[in-house]
């Protein structure tokens, strides 16, 4: 360091090597800057107005700078002033030295990356990066070692070879893809422009306590599923279902009313009938549930004697008699069908069984028929079939039927009502005794039963018997005795002479049911369909067989023919009734018997199913005439073949299409000229074809636009151009042949027109000058024009020459 004194100035000079020293001494402060001493003296003696005059001083300092030399005292003052005013910080010596070092380091931070192929033999691309930054992620690494560590750790898909700076080159890095990376593919983050890749921020791992994994400490519980006896659970009494548990019997309330009891039931039982769930009687272990009975007789009462070992329930019967009949039941497991007695006197019922509860009886006046006309039609519209279940004990009958008061609710309900009976308990619903108008009752009840949307499927298990009602109309009935085991006696409905009117309304609706009635019988069960017996006198029927069903008999009067003419046609149109029988089960189909006196029927077969017999009156022929044709009608319409339809449609459309085309005028897509119908219907493609006539017109119009050309010259150019186009003269070797043929084609015109011949000679001279024709060709063309037409010969081009006929070149002036 040397100190020099200049006139009026005192400066300190420091070499460049002193800039690298870390300790900044006052004697070593140099920056090549020269200022007058007066300036620095003013800086040494600060005044109060220095802060306000900083800008003025800076201007004076900048004006008085000679070279980059400043005295040491100046930098001291600048450093002290920079504490109060940051503006002087950049002018201090320490700041300038750091900036110089930074600039020097930046100048040496350049490094070159050579991107080479996989075999590391050839350089594909070279790139120079400053500040030792990464070329892939643009992160400044601060030095050669930092860059080396960063590349090896963050971009391990590539292979790097580092070279230190030498005399001939600076630091370099050879980059190549590893062979292992090619097998699995190159990472997308390491390829492409890193500036376009999104920036992802990863925060530091927070020191949080790990949640304890209590999965190993959880006690494993062994789940034990225990079976529950649902029969022992208490149940409610929804929808008036009886509740029976442990020999306790609860019966529905009795309704003893006056003559206007019909008004009561019309409001109460209808609401019961609209329940959302159907009633399903459930019987277990010798329990019996019997529906109500409707007894209607005229003069005398009827006594029912039941002498069975176990519980017996008798379903209702409908009898309209002048004289009553005693029914004796001396069998095991026999259910007596329901009875409807209309009489002036009451009926006594004798039950000699164990655990039998008598159902409440509803004894109404003559208007009881009106009651049932409003209540029982609700039976008909069940959304689900009636399901009846039985136990394995014998002697359980009549558990299929429910009271007339409860059956309406069964019909419209969507789910069954469950009658639950345990341990030889009996729940019997009330009985309804109506008057002489029982026929009016059936006219409204049975049709509704037939209109059910789904079949009634009684399910019988283990030697249980279900019997459906019968309709018997007679004036005098004899006693019926049954001495058979496991034989059902179907219910009898004995009505007056108006039974025919009843069936005219009931059985047709049975036929209109949407689905067949399917009866499912298991284990020696017998299902019998209803019978309609109408006669004046009925004889006794004896059954001495085991497990033999008696088919239903229809014994009608003279009006039976009229009944069946209305009923059986509807049966024929509906779906068939399919009785399902399993394990020695017998299903009997209905019979129609019409006679004044019926004979006794003896059946002595085992497990036999008798076909239906039809014994009709004189009008039976009318019945079959209406029923059998209905059976032959198919349920589905005939469908015409689609292929045949298409063929017919195509044939019809073809004729229509041709007629429409004939009435239209078509034009060419290129020439815009009208086309004939034959041209339109031809298979030729007119889309890409060239119309010579249109091209000739366009060529003529093009030549007419020329100015300073005579008509003869235009005429000659027009003929030559269309000749070359039509004869496809496209090569130099074609020109000699074209000249000869053109002379032959227009020989006569050239002889008549001297100007035309002149232009033809001038054109041949141009062709000869250009070397397209030789002297021999030129001579041939001249001899063709001088020779006669016969000697010249015909046109040998092979194409029609009519297109080159003489055409007028007259132009409208």
Curated annotation (Swiss-Prot):
CDD domains: VEFS-box_EMF2-like, ZnB-Zn_EMF2-like. Residues 648-783 are annotated as: VEFS-box. Pfam families: VEFS-Box (PF09733), Zn_SUZ12 (PF23320). Residues 15-26 have a biased composition (Acidic residues). It is found in: Nucleus. A zinc finger (C2H2-type) spans 134-155. Belongs to the VEFS (VRN2-EMF2-FIS2-SU(Z)12) family. Polycomb group (PcG) protein. PcG proteins act by forming multiprotein complexes, which are required to maintain the transcriptionally repressive state of homeotic genes throughout development. PcG proteins are not required to initiate repression, but to maintain it during later stages of development. They probably act via the methylation of histones, rendering chromatin heritably changed in its expressibility. Required to prevent the proliferation of the central cell by repressing unknown target genes before fertilization. Regulates the anteroposterior organization of the endosperm. Probably indirectly associated with FIE and/or MEA. In plants, PcG complexes are probably composed of a member of the EZ family (CLF or MEA), FIE, and a member of the VEFS family (FIS2, VRN2 or EMF2). This is Polycomb group protein FERTILIZATION-INDEPENDENT SEED 2. It comes from Arabidopsis thaliana (Mouse-ear cress). The gene is FIS2.
């Amino acid at each position: 360091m040397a100190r020099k004194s200049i006139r009026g100035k005192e400066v300190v000079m420091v070499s460049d090597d002193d800039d690298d020293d870390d300790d900044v001494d006052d004697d070593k402060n140099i920056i090549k800057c020269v200022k007058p001493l007066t300036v620095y003296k003013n800086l040494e003696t600060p005044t109060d107005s220095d802060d306000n005059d900083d800008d003025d001083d800076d201007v004076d300092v900048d004006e008085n700078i000679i070279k980059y030399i400043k005295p040491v005292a100046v930098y001291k003052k600048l450093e002290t002033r920079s504490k109060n005013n940051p503006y002087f910080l950049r002018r201090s010596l320490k700041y300038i030295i750091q900036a110089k070092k930074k600039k020097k380091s930046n100048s040496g931070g350049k490094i070159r990356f050579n991107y080479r192929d996989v075999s590391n033999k050839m350089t594909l691309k070279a790139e120079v990066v400053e500040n030792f930054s990464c070329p892939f992620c643009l992160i400044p690494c601060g030095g050669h070692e930092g860059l080396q560590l960063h590349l090896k750790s963050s971009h391990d898909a590539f292979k790097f070879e580092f070279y230190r700076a030498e005399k001939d080159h600076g630091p370099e890095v050879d980059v190549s893809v590893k062979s292992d990376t090619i097998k699995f593919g190159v990472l997308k983050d390491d390829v492409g422009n890193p500036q376009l890749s999104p920036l992802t921020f990863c925060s530091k791992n927070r020191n949080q306590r790990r949640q304890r994994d209590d999965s190993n400490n959880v006690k494993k519980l062994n789940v034990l599923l225990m079976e529950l006896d649902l029969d022992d659970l208490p149940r409610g009494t929804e929808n008036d279902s009886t509740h029976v548990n442990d020999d306790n019997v609860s019966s529905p309330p009795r309704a003893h009313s006056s003559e206007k009891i019909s008004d009561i039931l019309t409001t109460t039982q209808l609401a019961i009938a609209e329940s959302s769930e159907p009633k399903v009687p459930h019987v277990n272990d010798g329990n019996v549930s019997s529906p109500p009975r409707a007894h209607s007789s005229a003069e005398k009462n009827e006594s029912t004697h039941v002498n069975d070992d176990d519980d017996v329930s008798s379903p209702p019967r409908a009898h309209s008699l002048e004289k009553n009949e005693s029914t004796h039941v001396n069998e095991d497991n026999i259910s007596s069908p329901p009875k409807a007695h209309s009489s002036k006197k009451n009926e006594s019922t004798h039950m000699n069984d164990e655990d039998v509860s008598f159902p409440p009886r509803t004894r109404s006046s003559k208007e009881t028929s009106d009651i049932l006309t409003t209540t029982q039609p609700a039976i008909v519209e069940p959304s689900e079939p009636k399901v009846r279940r039985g136990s394995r004990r014998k002697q359980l009958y009549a558990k299929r039927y429910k009271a007339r008061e409860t059956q309406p609710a069964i019909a419209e309900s969507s789910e069954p009502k469950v009658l639950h009976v345990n341990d030889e308990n009996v729940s019997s619903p009330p009985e309804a005794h109506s008057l002489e108008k029982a026929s009016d009752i059936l006219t409204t009840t049975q049709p509704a039963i037939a209109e059910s949307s789904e079949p009634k499927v009684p399910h019988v298990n283990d030697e249980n018997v279900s019997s459906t009602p019968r309709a018997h109309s007679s004036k005098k009935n004899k006693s019926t005795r049954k001495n058979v085991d496991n034989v059902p006696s179907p219910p009898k409905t004995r009505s007056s002479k108006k039974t025919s009117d009843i069936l005219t309304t009931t059985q047709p609706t049975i036929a209109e049911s949407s689905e067949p009635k399917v009866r499912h019988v298991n284990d020696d069960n017998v299902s019998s369909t209803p019978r309609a017996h109408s006669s004046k006198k009925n004889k006794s029927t004896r059954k001495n067989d085991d497990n033999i069903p008696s088919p239903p008999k229809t014994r009608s009067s003279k009006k039976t023919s009229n009944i069946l003419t209305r009923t059986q046609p509807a049966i024929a149109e509906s779906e068939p009734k399919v009785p399902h029988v399993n394990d020695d089960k017998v299903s009997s189909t209905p019979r129609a018997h019409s006679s004044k006196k019926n004979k006794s029927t003896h059946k002595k077969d085992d497990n036999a199913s008798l076909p239906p017999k039809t014994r009709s009156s004189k009008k039976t022929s009318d019945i079959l005439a209406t029923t059998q044709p209905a059976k032959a009608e198919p349920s589905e319409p005939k469908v015409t073949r689609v292929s045949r339809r298409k063929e017919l449609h195509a044939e019809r459309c073809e004729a229509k299409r041709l007629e429409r085309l004939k009435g239209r005028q078509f034009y060419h897509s290129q020439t815009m000229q009208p086309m004939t119908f034959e041209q339109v219907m031809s298979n030729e493609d007119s889309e890409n074809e060239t119309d010579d006539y249109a091209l000739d017109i366009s060529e003529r119009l093009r030549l007419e636009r020329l100015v300073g050309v005579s008509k003869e010259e235009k005429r000659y150019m027009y003929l030559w151009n269309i000749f070359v186009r039509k004869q496809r003269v496209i090569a130099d070797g074609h020109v000699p042949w074209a000249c000869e043929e053109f002379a032959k084609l227009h020989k006569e015109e050239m002889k008549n027109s001297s100007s035309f011949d002149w232009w033809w000679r001038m054109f041949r001279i141009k062709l000869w000058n250009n070397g397209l024709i030789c002297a021999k060709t030129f001579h041939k063309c001249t001899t063709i024009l001088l020779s006669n037409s016969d000697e010249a010969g015909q046109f040998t081009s092979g194409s029609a020459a009519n297109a080159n006929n003489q055409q007028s070149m007259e132009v409208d002036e």
